[in-house]
Amino acid sequence: MFGLKQFYQNEVRIKLAQELDIKNPMLLPKLEKIVISVGAGAYAKDMKIMQNIAQTISLIAGQKAVITKAKKSVAGFKIREGMAVGAKVTLRNKRMYNFLEKLIVISLPRVKDFRGISRNGFDGRGNYTFGINEQLIFPEVVYDDIMVSHGMNITMVTSTDNDKEAFKLLELLGLPFAKVR
């Protein structure tokens, strides 16, 4: 791995300051955290599958995943309060940059017919979210160890509240966005 954090500090910050015309280096956008989450859906009732999902995310992230629980009971979804409904892990600092580098260099190129990730995942507050359909694109996941194939949502939280600045930051970090037609 070539050190994405050093790349950000030595090259990306300089380019961002020039392109966004920001004089104060403390105002430059930076990546604050990455959240990887999985909603279990129909598998929420089976605790073995929930444990397997959490273990898979832990392998991918390099950090222990937390099983998320329902805050309220919803009769339409047959969910009771306190029931396990998914898993998530929040990455910061070194683990965040290591995961992002692995995602860009190794995992996303393994996606079948990959033409870049959508530019439509920005939320208006400088955060970017996209989904991955299956966990097998990550080299840590062994096919024989998974009980059920599942996707995941990856949210990148930046320090800026502007989508344009967040897009520029992620683009300069090397995130492969789809080309505009």
Curated annotation (Swiss-Prot):
GO terms for biological process: translation. GO terms for molecular function: rRNA binding; structural constituent of ribosome; tRNA binding. It comes from the Bacteria. The keyword tRNA processing does not apply. Keywords: Ribonucleoprotein, Ribosomal protein, RNA-binding, rRNA-binding, tRNA-binding. One of its GO terms (cellular component) is ribonucleoprotein complex. InterPro entries: Ribosomal_uL5 (IPR002132), Ribosomal_uL5_bac-type (IPR020930), Ribosomal_uL5_C (IPR031309), Ribosomal_uL5_CS (IPR020929), Ribosomal_uL5_dom_sf (IPR022803), Ribosomal_uL5_N (IPR031310). The keyword Transmembrane does not apply. This is one of the proteins that bind and probably mediate the attachment of the 5S RNA into the large ribosomal subunit, where it forms part of the central protuberance. In the 70S ribosome it contacts protein S13 of the 30S subunit (bridge B1b), connecting the 2 subunits; this bridge is implicated in subunit movement. Contacts the P site tRNA; the 5S rRNA and some of its associated proteins might help stabilize positioning of ribosome-bound tRNAs. PANTHER family: 60S RIBOSOMAL PROTEIN L11-RELATED (PTHR11994). Belongs to the universal ribosomal protein uL5 family. HAMAP family: Ribosomal_uL5_B. Part of the 50S ribosomal subunit; part of the 5S rRNA/L5/L18/L25 subcomplex. Contacts the 5S rRNA and the P site tRNA. Forms a bridge to the 30S subunit in the 70S ribosome. This is Large ribosomal subunit protein uL5. The gene is rplE.
